[in-house]
Amino acid sequence: MCDDDVAALVIDNGSGMVKAGFAGDDAPRAVFPSIVGRPRHQGVMVGMGQKDSYVGDEAQSKRGILTLKYPMEHGIVTNWDDMEKIWHHTFYNELRVAPEEHPVLLTEAPLNPKANREKMTQIMFETFNSPAMYVAIQAVLSLYASGRTTGIVFDSGDGVSHTVPIYEGYALPHAILRLDLAGRDLTDYLMKILTERGYSFTTTAEREIVRDIKEKLCYVALDFEQEMQTAASSSSLEKSYELPDGQVITIGNERFRCPEALFQPAFLGMESAGIHETCYNSIMKCDVDIRKDLYANTVLSGGSTMFPGIADRMQKEITALAPPTMKIKIIAPPERKYSVWIGGSILASLSTFQQMWISKQEYDESGPSIVHRKCF
């Protein structure tokens, strides 16, 4: 869509990254970390035009002198002032648009508290004067992006994971399962097991280094026990990583032990079922007649599904749980890191969607609760 004048904005607010851009585009124009940084020591950088807060990549690059905070935890906004800073940064610095001129589509985690989406609605209309807005469920958008309207989405980002069965475009709320285990927990776990190897990572700045190690070197083993034996008996699985200061560290079985926690949350001291079981449990909560369609359309989405080997392992684990004759298909689109955003871009540019927007006028008449009537 070349006509940015009236194009809707699509903002996928993740716990870890904000993905933002224009409806009709095939990828987000701005992707930056959902972080707000504040100087650790007031006045250290006298005369450097020091600001009281930094957002996104700028906070990331100055992380050595800042305390970094994520305003979203587990997919839910915990600090609205910081969240507002992130939205302000998105509109004015990243997309360079006037928010009062564009309808905006926001995304939210399934099973989000009602107050959360009301507050989002209120901020968009009252702080940013949006002409119209809509709040869509992330997993549903991922399914649209894969070209389906029925299937089960396993969506795992930085802060929260969900299994969301969707039938003919509607999420089935009674069968949605939520798992507070996602990318950030895996990063923390990798920090912990690297410490056991004698490397110390403790600060918020060092956590970002470990996140990079995770994204570049970790993978999911098809058979965990087998892989552990291979790692113990040879150095074939070892990889080296150069830290920003030039020190080189070696990482071995940590490469697959880290994401294994998705399948065995006990590694993190959590009592919940692994992602394969959660998926299966979610399917079993659905009507028996639609299960076949869900098994055959299991869609992975979100950054924490980007580990190499995760789709094959998921296939293997779900096959072991499902009835023996069931056809199981795991769909892992290569662009799944952004599939929520892509689905939003598709939805907001459909002509049939245009009547779905909540307008400023409707908001003024009904208040924030309008969001529950119009977005479901």
Swiss-Prot record:
UniProt keyword Signal present: no
Cross-referenced SMART domains: ACTIN
InterPro entries membership: Actin, Actin/actin-like_CS, Actin_CS, ATPase_NBD
Modified residues (N-acetylaspartate): D3
Compartment list: Cytoplasm; Cytoplasm, Cytoskeleton
Residue positions assigned to the propeptide: 1-2
Record-level Gene Ontology MF annotations: ATP binding; hydrolase activity
PANTHER family per record: ACTIN (PTHR11937)
Function: Actins are highly conserved proteins that are involved in various types of cell motility and are ubiquitously expressed in all eukaryotic cells.
Name of the protein in its database record: Actin, cytoskeletal 1A
Organism: Strongylocentrotus purpuratus
Gene: CYIA
